[in-house]
């Protein structure tokens, strides 16, 4: 079990008979999947009912079989389990497919030093996600207390995911 990209995991296991070279080569040459934009939202207490399931929200014109990662067309809403006996949510994650191309221009900048344009970009992506999800959860916008975001750059920086792939 590993929390880093499979190609990186395989490269960490040296001289093992359990991993043959043909397997190593296959894993190393697989195409990467798209990455994810994630908005982790801390909610104001008592405002958004907890739902014990994921909710998928798609634009009416979204092609679910051919994902366009350059536009915010689909968002997964994931509720964190609240305190026992609470009927309201404390935290949700909004996840949307995202292309490496959208964040590639910041790849040479270290974490925390990607500039105001990167911060503005993440705020706009968050707004796009909230705007789409509002059609299903109209009370969401008023319930937002704080937002933390991650992009494919975050996944590359923290879990060695090639091009921020969600693998």
Sequence positions of predicted segments:
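Mid-domain catalytic core of redox enzymes
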Residues: 2-87
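A glycine-rich dinucleotide-binding beta-alpha-beta segment and adjacent secondary-structure elements
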Residues: 135-167
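Hydrophobic, well-ordered secondary-structure elements that form the walls
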Residues: 1, 41, 94, 133
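Flavin (FAD/FMN)-binding glycine-rich loop and adjacent Rossmann-like elements that form
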Residues: 65-70, 80, 89, 95-101, ...
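Charged, low-complexity, helix-prone segments enriched in Lys/Glu/Asp/Gln
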Residues: 27, 118-125, 155, 159
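Generic solvent-exposed, charged/amphipathic alpha-helical segments
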Residues: 126-134
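Conserved FAD/dinucleotide-binding core of flavoprotein oxidoreductases
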Residues: 7-13, 86-127
